[in-house]
């Protein structure tokens, strides 16, 4: 499962240039490029881990869409960061990972909500928790069998250059973080998200937190030691992938 490592490497190489001030950042909260990249890495891991998903994708029985605006059978609408489902219309563009096409989805079989907490960890706790919680609620209210997954990237860097706090081109404003305490509190807070063990239950079908060290100026690294989730934890990335794969096989094979 390589998405966490790939995402950290992607952030290291990514450049978001402030057109007004000239500063260059790895991450900008008002851009969705990081969410798109993370969802693509997750999708690649799912295709590699699930022979069933891969087989159905190669047969065009499944397609995917990123930033998918979908209306569920009950009339509720939601923009899904990543959606995989049955096709209504298959795009003529090239396939992703030489496996799965994009297009217009008829029925969503799997969705993933992607969140990022790079700074202001304490202030972000209620908002991120509520947004994640509402995502699985909307998906399951629309289709009890659909797999609802969530993933959050939490920053453990002790300093962070926030694009929204920069006022001039002469001097960077650098925010200070009390680490690893800030990251640990966010990780523990998100462990309160429910994870269901059957389609009658309430909660995500799979959830993961990954931790990165990103000051938003230099290289970004994946943080794998505590307080990051460890193997066996219910919010570890490998378990997240295995839970999605198992649920897909049980419900949609």
Positions of the model-derived regions?
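Active-site metal-binding core of divalent-cation-utilizing nuclease and nuclease-like domains
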Residues: 58-105
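Short glycine-/polar-rich loops that comprise or flank the Walker A/P-loop
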Residues: 107-108, 144-148
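Short, charged, amphipathic alpha-helix that recurs within catalytic cores of restriction-modification
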Residues: 125-142, 193
């Amino acid at each position: 499962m390589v998405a966490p490592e790939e995402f950290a490497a992607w952030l290291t190489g990514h450049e978001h240039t402030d057109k007004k001030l000239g500063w260059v950042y790895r991450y900008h909260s008002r851009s969705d490029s990081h969410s798109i990249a993370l969802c693509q890495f997750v999708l690649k891991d799912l295709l590699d881990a699930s022979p069933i998903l891969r087989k159905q994708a190669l047969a065009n029985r499944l397609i995917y869409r990123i930033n998918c605006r979908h209306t569920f059978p009950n009339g509720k609408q939601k923009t899904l960061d990543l959606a995989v489902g049955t096709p209504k219309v298959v795009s003529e563009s090239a396939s992703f990972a030489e496996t799965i096409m994009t297009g217009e989805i008829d029925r969503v079989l799997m969705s993933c909500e992607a969140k990022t907490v790079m700074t202001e960890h304490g202030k972000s706790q209620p908002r991120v928790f509520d947004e994640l919680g509402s995502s699985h609620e909307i998906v399951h209210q629309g289709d009890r069998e659909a797999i609802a997954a969530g993933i959050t990237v939490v920053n453990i860097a002790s300093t962070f250059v926030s694009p929204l706090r920069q006022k001039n081109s002469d001097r960077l404003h650098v925010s200070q973080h009390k680490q690893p305490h800030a990251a640990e509190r966010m990780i523990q807070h998100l462990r309160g998200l429910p994870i269901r063990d059957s389609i009658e239950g309430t909660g995500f079908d799979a959830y993961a937190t990954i931790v990165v060290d990103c000051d938003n100026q230099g290289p970004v690294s994946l943080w794998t030691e505590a307080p990051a989730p460890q193997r066996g934890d219910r919010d570890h990335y490998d378990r997240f992938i295995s839970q999605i794969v198992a649920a897909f096989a049980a419900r949609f094979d």
